[in-house]
Design a protein with these regions (language model features):
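Phosphate-binding active sites in nucleotide-utilizing proteins
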Residues: 117, 130-194, 198-203
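Hydrophobic, well-ordered secondary-structure elements that form the walls
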Residues: 176, 213, 235, 274, ...
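Internal gly/pro-rich beta-alpha loop/helix module
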Residues: 1-124
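Short, structured coil segments at secondary-structure junctions
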Residues: 9, 33-36, 154, 231-233, ...
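Structural motif
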Residues: 14, 133, 177-179, 211, ...
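Cysteine-nucleophile active-site neighborhood
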Residues: 158, 183-260
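C-terminal and late-domain segments of enzyme folds
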Residues: 82, 127-128, 140-152, 157-158, ...
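Residue-level signal for short, function-critical loop segments
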Residues: 17, 136-138, 241, 313-314
C-alpha cells in the first residue's frame, strides 16, 4: 500500500483485532520496517457485532443498538490507542500539504472541494442555483457525503425525494441523481409506483439531466428480477433487464475514462463497484480499469446530459464531472423557464 501512497497520506497504523500484548510485540517491528508510528490497537470485542446481508452492508436504521455499539467502540479505542498523537499527526500532515499547495495558514477540517476556486464559482452562480432532485429512501441510500457537498459547492441545490413513497419527482427539479442502494429488495414497491416510474422516464425523455449509479442505474432499466426470481417493470429508460448472477460480478476500485468526452474533460474519475446484480446492457461509453492489475471492461451509458452505470463515482477525484452536471442542470433550468 505504501508503494502506491504517493501523497504520503498514510501517517500511522492502528492494529485491528489484536490484543494489547501482541500490539506491544509488533510495534517496534512495524515502526522499524515501515517507518510508520503504531498508534495503538483495537482488541477483539465480542459485544460488538454488525449484521450483514449479501453485500456485507446493512443500513444504520436497520440495526438496533447501533449508537450504543459505536460508543462502546469509541471508549475502547480511547483506552488502547493514542488519539492525541493521532490528531497531532493529522495536523502536521495538513500543515505540510498546505504549504506544498501554496497556502500559508493551517486549513481547518473543511468541506471537501470547497477550495478558493470552487468558492469563487459558487459566488458567481448563487443567483441561479439549479435544483438537483436526489433519490433517498430504503431503496436508494448509498451516497458519498463528499459528492453531495461538492454538488452544492458548484452551485447545485439538493432536494430529496422518494421513488418508493412519492407519486412524482419534485416539480422544481432541474436534474436527477439516483444513487445506489437495494432496489432489488424493493422491486415490487418500485414497480407498483407507476406514476413515479413514468415521471422519471418522461423527465429524462424531455431533456432533464440525470446521473444514475448502481441501484439507480438498475431502476432505469425496463425490468428488474428480484431475489425470488420475479420480473418487475422499472422506469424503462434503458432497454434490458437487471438480474442476480449469484456471485460478485465486479468488485473493487476502478479508474473510469470516457471513450468520447462529455463529463470528465479528458481525465479519469475514481470509482468503486461491488454488486451481485448485473445488466444485459451495461453500456459502452466508458472504460473501467483496475488500478493494479489493469483488468478493464466497458461500461456506462452517457451523452452530454446523462450518465448511467454501475460504478459509484468519487466526484472529488475529477470535479469536472460535477461542474458539467451542474451546468447541464442550469441549462435545462433556463430552457424550461424560457418556454
Amino acid at each position: 500500500i505504501l508503494q502506491y501512497d504517493r501523497d504520503h497520506r498514510i501517517i500511522g497504523v492502528i492494529l485491528n483485532r489484536t490484543s494489547e500484548g501482541f500490539c506491544r510485540t509488533m510495534t517496534p517491528v512495524i515502526e522499524k520496517e515501515l517507518g510508520l508510528p503504531v498508534l495503538g490497537c483495537f482488541p477483539v470485542q465480542k459485544s460488538l457485532h454488525l449484521e450483514s446481508r449479501h453485500l456485507g452492508l446493512k443500513m444504520p436504521q436497520e440495526m438496533e443498538g447501533l449508537r450504543k455499539q459505536v460508543n462502546q467502540a469509541a471508549e475502547k479505542l480511547e483506552e488502547t490507542a493514542d488519539l492525541d498523537r493521532m490528531l497531532q499527526l493529522l495536523q502536521s500532515w495538513a500543515l505540510l500539504h498546505a504549504f506544498r499547495d501554496g497556502k500559508t495558514k493551517l486549513p481547518k477540517l473543511q468541506e471537501p472541494g470547497k477550495d478558493k476556486g470552487v468558492l469563487q464559482k459558487k459566488e458567481k452562480q448563487q443567483e441561479e442555483c439549479p435544483v438537483i432532485a436526489v433519490a433517498k429512501d430504503e431503496a436508494f441510500c448509498f451516497y458519498y457525503e463528499d459528492n453531495l457537498r461538492l454538488l452544492e459547492a458548484y452551485g447545485g441545490k439538493l432536494v430529496w425525494f422518494s421513488p418508493l413513497g412519492q407519486e412524482k419527482i419534485p416539480e422544481e427539479a432541474d436534474a436527477l441523481l439516483l444513487g445506489g442502494g437495494y432496489p432489488e429488495l424493493c422491486a415490487r414497491q418500485l414497480s407498483e409506483n407507476v406514476s413515479m416510474r413514468n415521471s422519471i422516464r418522461e423527465a429524462i425523455e424531455n431533456g432533464m439531466p440525470s446521473v444514475a449509479e448502481c441501484g439507480g442505474f438498475m431502476y432505469l432499466h425496463e425490468s428488474m428480477t428480484d431475489e425470488e426470481g420475479e420480473n418487475w417493470p422499472m422506469a424503462g429508460v434503458i432497454t434490458g433487464n437487471c438480474h442476480n448472477r449469484g456471485k460478485l460480478v465486479r468488485f473493487g476500485y476502478v479508474n473510469v475514462t470516457e471513450q468520447t468526452s462529455h463529463f470528465l474533460a479528458g481525465k479519469p474519475v475514481r470509482a468503486h463497484e461491488f454488486h451481485y446484480y448485473d445488466s444485459d446492457n451495461n453500456g459502452e461509453s466508458c472504460v473501467a480499469v483496475k488500478p493494479v492489475r489493469g483488468t478493464s471492461w466497458t461500461c456506462i451509458h452517457e451523452d452530454d446530459r446523462n450518465w448511467w452505470g454501475y460504478p459509484h463515482l468519487y466526484y472529488p477525484s475529477n470535479p469536472a464531472f460535477v461542474e458539467h452536471f451542474v451546468q447541464a442542470a442550469r441549462l435545462y433550468h433556463r430552457e424550461r423557464n424560457a418556454k
